[in-house]
Regions:
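Single, function-defining residue in the core of a domain
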Residues: 1-6, 17-24, 31, 35-41, ...
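A short, well-structured juxtamembrane/interface segment
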Residues: 7-13
Length: 322
């Protein structure tokens, strides 16, 4: 029910959403959610995550892939499955994206199928490249020039390397955007917006408390999931309509209200909102005005270190799966 409500909500508010250069900008990423261990959930094939050949985590896991509108802060679409396959989920979601849209991906997603799907749908992509990317794109790793244009299965793609001035290291990207937009400054600013999907996932788990499920049946879990998305979008749209238009969307300085306070008020009075009682919108506007503050995005100034953390699935929290 709430999945349909979410899609209806998106269509209803489409004209209110803001764009960049006439493009809706989305970011796709994945999230792992812990489910309660019940017979109904196990029967629906939601099992623990594999930690070795014969062992898995005790609690069942749901693998969620979501597309977030990073300019407006709302959930565009999502897929959930018992197994981890973010690339297949992304390919499926791209089919519903607008022609005038740009989707940003991290290093996991770059593959031929996703490139061809974007080409079929006539929309744009921006991939960050990993060292083991397809052979045609590895040219940029050795090339002396900053930008290079190639073709992958008939699709024209612009490759570019962007230098981090603080670490003096290069990051590599691939995009089918018009070549006038494939510049170091633009690509860096665009990719920095991908962090908004990580912030949204933090809100899902820390503010909305998605993993504190009320139901122990998979249908109830799915209803709670899509209800959370609907409420999240409702709050973000209220904030979007109240805050003034931003001239430079990629500026380090921005204004933001207290999302947790606004979400808690709306979720506590949800039935009053559904009945459209008078005066509630004024309260939301007042909360937004009172809690909005100027903030600054801080970039990482040190070299990234990838360490080997302690396993999130200690032996005592796993079970045999033979």
């Amino acid at each position: 029910f709430f999945q349909k409500q979410l899609y209806n909500q998106k269509e209803k508010n489409k004209l209110k959403k803001k764009t960049w250069n006439g493009l809706y900008v989305y970011a796709v990423d994945g999230l792992q959610l812990t489910l309660p261990k019940s017979d109904d959930i196990i029967k629906a094939n939601y099992n623990g995550r594999k930690v070795s050949k014969y062992r898995e985590s005790y609690m069942p896991k749901m693998f969620l892939t979501a597309a977030l509108d990073v300019i407006n802060g709302v959930v565009k679409d999502a897929r959930e499955y018992p197994t981890l396959n973010e690339v297949a989920d992304a390919i499926d979601m791209v089919k519903s994206f607008e022609d005038n849209s740009l989707t940003i991906y991290d290093r996991l997603y770059c593959c031929r199928k996703l490139i061809l799907e974007h080409n079929n749908q006539n929309n744009y992509f921006l991939f960050r490249l990993r060292k083991s990317v397809m052979q045609e794109m590895r040219l940029i790793f050795k090339c002396k020039s900053i930008r290079k244009t190639i073709e992958v299965d008939g699709v024209t793609i612009h490759l570019i390397k962007v230098k981090n001035p603080k670490t003096n290291e290069f990051d590599y990207f691939a995009s089918n955007l018009p070549i006038r937009l494939v510049t170091e400054k633009t690509i860096r600013s665009l990719y920095n917006q991908r962090w908004e999907v990580e912030v949204a996932f933090r809100d899902f788990t820390q503010t909305i408390r998605l993993e504190e499920w009320h139901s122990k049946k998979i249908n109830g879990i799915r209803q709670e999931l899509w209800t959370a998305f609907w409420l999240y979008n409702y709050c973000k749209l209220k904030i979007l309509l109240k805050l003034p238009a931003v001239k430079n969307r990629f500026s380090d300085h921005y204004q933001k209200p207290n999302f947790k306070l606004i979400f808690n008020y709306i979720s506590t009075n949800i039935f009053s909102f559904l009945k459209r009682k008078r005066g509630l919108s004024k309260v939301i506007e007042e909360l937004i005005d009172r809690t909005t503050e100027k903030r600054r995005r801080h970039s990482r100034s040190y070299k990234r270190e990838i360490k080997s953390p302690m396993s999130p699935f200690p032996y005592n929290n796993t079970v045999w799966n033979i």
